[in-house]
């Protein structure tokens, strides 16, 4: 939703913030949000509308369902003792305000830009993102000889993690990476500004587009998202080339 890359069957990762000085605001907005989630997820004779995931809120599922904007901004910008993890900043690269008054949306974009512009330790950031990729791989093992268009090495998750690393590590020097234009657009921009060797960025963008199409088709037809390796040889090689260009030999450890 945030990255404008919603697929068939995708859940919605939502974070709810409010800007209201009323002392009961948190309680009131939490009740409203619970009703909203119920409306969006209720099972009907025609199925359900969306699955909702609120785990990206500050402190995950152990945190408050709704957060004041000031608390959210402090959390994301690492002010105070309760601060965001790197994987939450990865999510911020794809975040977008989808509902709310214009002023609050602008304040959110300011916070998002500040997070992306933060200068970071490149090797440390790389290690954290590679470690998170390993955890995702452990949680979604690929069985059999097929190529899973999302989770196999060289597939969509590898491409997405590489893009997120580029945005977080280079956003302080390349403002063109701040715009939330989706993975394909960001790969093209990273290629244009010299962050990727020719033609790695363009090839990975084409691969991501192909893998997305395969995923859409499989979900519409209620089919598995694994395809024969030979069907996606070029796309897989492009995804692996991107990962190697960004993370180096760490790809072998995923």
Located regions from the model:
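A nucleotide- and high-energy phosphate-metabolite-utilizing enzyme signature
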Residues: 1-254
């Amino acid at each position: 939703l945030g990255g404008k890359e919603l697929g068939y069957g995708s859940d919605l990762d939502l974070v709810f913030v409010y800007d209201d000085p009323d002392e009961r605001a948190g309680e009131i907005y939490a009740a409203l949000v619970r009703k909203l989630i119920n409306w969006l997820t209720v099972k009907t004779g025609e199925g359900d509308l969306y699955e909702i995931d609120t785990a990206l809120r500050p402190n995950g599922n152990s945190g408050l369902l709704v957060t004041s904007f000031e608390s959210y901004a402090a959390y994301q910008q690492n002010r105070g003792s309760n601060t965001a993890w790197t994987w939450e900043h990865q999510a911020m690269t794809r975040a977008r305000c989808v509902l709310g008054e214009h002023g609050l949306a602008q304040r959110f974009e300011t916070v998002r830009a500040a997070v992306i512009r933060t200068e970071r330790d490149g090797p440390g950031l790389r290690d954290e993102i590679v470690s998170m990729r390993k955890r995702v791989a452990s949680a979604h093992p690929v069985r059999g000889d097929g190529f899973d268009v999302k989770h196999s090495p060289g597939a969509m998750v590898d491409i997405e993690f590489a893009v997120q690393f580029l945005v977080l590590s280079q956003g302080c020097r390349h403002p063109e990476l701040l715009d939330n234009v989706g993975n394909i657009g960001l790969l093209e921009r990273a290629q244009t500004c010299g962050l990727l060797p020719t033609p790695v960025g363009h090839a990975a963008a084409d691969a991501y587009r192909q893998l997305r199409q395969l995923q859409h088709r499989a979900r519409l037809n209620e089919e598995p998202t694994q395809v024969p390796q030979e069907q996606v040889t070029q796309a897989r090689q492009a995804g692996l080339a991107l990962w190697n260009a960004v993370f180096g030999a760490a790809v072998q450890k995923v």
